[in-house]
């Protein structure tokens, strides 16, 4: 029997990453969800034309939606062009949907997309995080910790 792959061995191609989310929000948990796309959107993603930095996820009428994400138009699509900033449905189980909805009902919580990628089967997946906005002091603390860790690594390298 084959042993399961570790996270380092999993092969996936990152399409878009929301780097600002880790700085602006305190991520409590993350979840991998599927996304409903049109054919021209998938082809455009394979070319690398997307941005999820300004987008967010929301629960409407018992469904999870990705709002304000940008997927560039596909140049070869003539008649079936997609809308660049349309709402895209996210695929998630009912149990996870109710858990996410309950999480967003708490004060200051939101759903933020972290990474969009092709998984090992070639399907587009989105990792969303349940997040709470950071205050300015929290951001400074995070920066100070990161700087201190860099300094420690430099000192360890010099001593070796």
From Swiss-Prot:
Gene3D superfamilies: 2.40.280.10. NCBIfam families: PRK05422.1, smpB. Required for rescue of stalled ribosomes mediated by trans-translation. Binds to transfer-messenger RNA (tmRNA), required for stable association of tmRNA with ribosomes. tmRNA and SmpB together mimic tRNA shape, replacing the anticodon stem-loop with SmpB. tmRNA is encoded by the ssrA gene; the 2 termini fold to resemble tRNA(Ala) and it encodes a 'tag peptide', a short internal open reading frame. During trans-translation Ala-aminoacylated tmRNA acts like a tRNA, entering the A-site of stalled ribosomes, displacing the stalled mRNA. It comes from the Bacteria. One of its GO terms (cellular component) is cytosol. GO terms for molecular function: RNA binding. Pfam families: SmpB. It comes from Dinoroseobacter shibae (strain DSM 16493 / NCIMB 14021 / DFL 12). This is SsrA-binding protein. Disulfide bonds: none annotated. Its main location: cytoplasm. Keywords: Cytoplasm, RNA-binding. The keyword Cytoplasm applies. It is found in: Cytoplasm.
């Amino acid at each position: 029997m084959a042993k399961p792959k570790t996270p380092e061995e999993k092969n996936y191609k990152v399409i878009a990453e929301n780097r600002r989310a880790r700085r602006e929000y305190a991520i409590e948990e993350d979840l991998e969800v599927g996304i409903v796309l049109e054919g021209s959107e998938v082809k455009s993603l394979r070319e690398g034309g997307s941005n999820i930095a300004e987008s967010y996820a929301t629960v409407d009428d018992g469904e999870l939606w990705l709002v304000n994400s940008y997927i560039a138009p596909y140049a070869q699509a003539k008649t079936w062009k997609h809308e660049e900033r349309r709402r895209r449905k996210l695929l998630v189980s009912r149990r996870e949907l109710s858990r996410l909805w309950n999480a967003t009902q708490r004060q200051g919580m939101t759903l933020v997309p972290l990474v969009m990628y092709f998984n090992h089967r070639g399907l587009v997946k989105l990792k969303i995080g349940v997040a709470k906005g950071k205050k300015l002091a929290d951001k400074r603390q995070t920066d100070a910790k990161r700087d201190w860790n860099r300094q420690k690594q430099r000192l360890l390298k010099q001593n070796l």
